[in-house]
Amino acid sequence: MTFEEMIERSEHIVFFGGAGVSTASGIPDFRSAEGIGGERAEEVLSHDFFVNRTEEFFDFYRKNLLFPDAVPNAAHYALAKLEKRGKLKAVITQNVDGLHRKAGSNVVYELHGNVNYNYCMNCGKRHGAEYVAGSNGVPR
């Protein structure tokens, strides 16, 4: 049975993906030689680092996680098409880029959040990626 036949016969597909999906959109992954930092990224993006070194956290966030010009690629659109056909029930992603939603997928579980939805722990307001990108130091 071919992959296409498996998809056609399936009724409850769930896609679980990560950085490999968005690299074709120009977004580097975390762990490859061309990626954005491996263990360093995991340290900087931890809650402890955020609490104790907030300004450095946001500098890293702005430089390494925001890709305002990135657009969905063929994989993102193919998954959205499968959802519209009723084949794909959900996308579960480790990516934070929001490209699955931009491509038209509606049932998306973003395990590590989405850079387009930022929540201020002090005032409770929500901010888009543009707000963080346009700020210096810690967004206020």
Regions found by a protein language model. Name each.
Residues M1-R140:
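Conserved catalytic core of sirtuin-type NAD+-dependent deacylases
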